[in-house]
């Protein structure tokens, strides 16, 4: 044998050993995992393919072409199975075929050398053609990773740009959701879909208050306000800034420096101008807005409620405390709550709500800590004096009962932690309600809990009297508390008229459209029968509401074929995990076994809320698609001794956390693969446009890439728009645009509101969890888009940025 031939044989032996080893490992993993999957009632594919691949490995070690043919047969079967299992969806096919295709290309390109080694006809041409075509197909698959794959394609019809009515042109963004009804719609069109590509950074401001990025600590989730030439900001520790609307230069700073052991965030501030005339309601029978006391010290005010339980008013002109508000500018929100109220058990994270001359405040009560927790009482204060005007105590037989000295509000009652809305024509405040303590066990719940938990509540803003309440989950055991600001819209009815409505999205991926006056649904809602679990004494509801006439977003009933992974290996493990859990669809009740909740307690939709374009009756909403596995475990005497404070990372794999005062501790975690990737198929987060005239999805696109994240938190650097979990909210404009920033990658994006096409994006220094806002400067007439960037959720990169963009001159 000549030296070159001997050398080639050595190379072939080494290569066949490496290739055979790869086949053996793959086949063995398939056989072991596939056997387990079959035992759980799952697919036979992995076991059958594994046996074929393992056998092909032994022939490959022997450098025999039989190994190639066996693997080729396995690959053909894989392609057929993948098409049957996943259809023609890109990401599911990518997961099933990319790795096997790589092995197939390798064995086919090895075939001529093996046949030559066995002194057979090499078959070079067909082997190289098939191998080359497979490589080309893989390159096509790689190219497809960088193309957005819409889950719902737009019709192609371009919505016309409607000129701004001068009477409706936006002057200020002076509420958390732009207006009191939370539209997040900007009636400005200087920046529009035709020129947004020319948007450039105009200024950059730094607060000096950094986030931690853990998800459980300090997070920047702010939406700024703008009034006149001032932009008002707050930081995770509730420090307030006023900056110049054109230059971004600091005008004043109000030091607050609130602290908590966990969950430090300020989603926004509130603004009130006492020099403006009061707007009285026009609805017949509505209670008048209360008159104000004389006010000269602070004619214009900015309010923040803090994570350590204070409501603070500062002068909007100077930043100085308004001494006539409460005690030297501060109201103590711990008053009347009883013991154990220290944050993070009791906190206020969402912006306070200005409702006429009343400022309304809810609270965040820590989840799954104890049956005895601070009450979720809703309180309203005079905007000038800070005196308590009314309280709504959901567990009290008289919710508006006025406490006597030494009394406290009912413990563990239903709270409202998200932003509220206000209708000045009705003088009514609309509240998204949470759950009574604890969230995943309801054995101690009262009739009042069942009434108010996970409901939309309408209260008279002057008196606090209940107008109506609408329940969206019965005996909520899933932590499906209503997470977002109710949106007040004029809803198009099928007869061509419109009705004042409240629209709210839920963690369960549903939308409820309610008559604003009566609270009755304006779209069809059914009661869906559900299965119960095995918890003794649990007050199971046998049915749950389903809003069937509105789109369902990311809450489909999962099947084994919906399981996904970056490779077939983690996909197989996700299949095993899925089949190992009890799962009955959307309302799978927690039990003593391991069950799956999809979507989980993050949603679905969360606090980012909805943007509504009244010119076209389009609604825009982002979502995340994360499952949650959960198990209730009987507590031991040792568990009872543990004192939880509400700062535990119960969703990040720290183990079972005792729920004091209940029979159980709870163990739960996100339904993810070993690589830290959600187990169900992408997208994991989308932007959806809903045409409210037809009540259908107009378009839906994935949000975010894996450029700044990836498996096990490793930054992949790939601009592959797979669609990642989102937080924060959208902003729509009359310029035909939807802006969004709260993705896992570090971008502010602008989409065409007609079809979801990305028209522009700007790289941010770190990620954002904030909602963009926009205004037109009264000095320069220039429109700005502003967003905060303190770091994406659980990102290693933290910041303190507020950045404005405007068109180039």
Swiss-Prot record:
Enzyme Commission code(s) on record: 1.1.5.8
SUPFAM superfamilies tied to this protein: Quinoprotein alcohol dehydrogenase-like
CDD domains the record matches: PQQ_mGDH
Enzyme's top EC category: oxidoreductase
Cofactor requirements of the protein: pyrroloquinoline quinone
Superkingdom of origin: Bacteria
Known pathway: Aromatic compound metabolism; 3,4-dihydroxybenzoate biosynthesis; 3-dehydroquinate from D-quinate (PQQ route): step 1/1
Induction, per UniProt: By protocatechuate.
Annotated catalysed reactions: L-quinate + a quinone = 3-dehydroquinate + a quinol; shikimate + a quinone = 3-dehydroshikimate + a quinol
Protein family per UniProt: Belongs to the bacterial PQQ dehydrogenase family.
Function description: Can act either on quinate or on shikimate.
Name of the molecule in the record: Quinate/shikimate dehydrogenase (quinone)
Originating organism: Acinetobacter baylyi (strain ATCC 33305 / BD413 / ADP1)
Gene from which this protein is expressed: quiA
